[in-house]
From Swiss-Prot:
SUPFAM superfamilies: Ribosome recycling factor, RRF. This is Ribosome-recycling factor. Keywords: Cytoplasm, Protein biosynthesis. GO terms for cellular component: cytosol. It is found in: Cytoplasm. CDD domains: RRF. GO terms for biological process: cytoplasmic translational termination. It holds the Pfam family RRF. Responsible for the release of ribosomes from messenger RNA at the termination of protein biosynthesis. May increase the efficiency of translation by recycling ribosomes from one round of translation to another. One of its GO terms (molecular function) is ribosomal large subunit binding. The keyword Cytoplasm applies. Belongs to the RRF family. PANTHER family: MITOCHONDRIAL RIBOSOME RECYCLING FACTOR PSEUDO 1, RIBOSOME RECYCLING FACTOR.
Amino acid sequence: MISDLKKTTEQKMQKSIDALKTDLAKIRTGRAHTGLLDHVMVEYYGSMVPINQVANITLIDARTIGVQTWEKPMLGKVEKAIRDCDLGLNPANMGEIIRVPMPALTEERRRDLTKVVRQEGETAKVAVRNLRRDANQHLKDAVKDKTISEDDERRSQDDIQKLTDKYVAEIDKLLAQKEQELMQI
């Protein structure tokens, strides 16, 4: 029972880390990367699909993404979807390919994005701490039901605290990397 609780708690904490990585990947730095457009949805014959299902996304250079649709009539829809996404990008339709230049970030915008990164990190830390609280509550309930001893509870709480510390440290590391990425010119 205790090992199952630890395992499920660790899996949930890992999901929090994965969600943070996904959220951080959406935050635009000055450098282009193909994952930046992953969440852009395009209308394709009446249904909304991810952009990577209707186009090939490549890097043209360090500051430009190239989007080549598989069907030429989709160029306009893909261009509109990129323009309408919340990344502040201005795509240029070149006839065969859509060029998406990455505008340079201003100092003020970098600071704003750093605040957003910290906020995302704090949300992830709160999620990890809530998982710790839930696990500890399960342990207390098990002691109350006399399923486990108090010694097992204390040992398990220590293990869960170590897990929490490990994942909070990983969150801090991810945040530091993203902030450093944002501040590079």
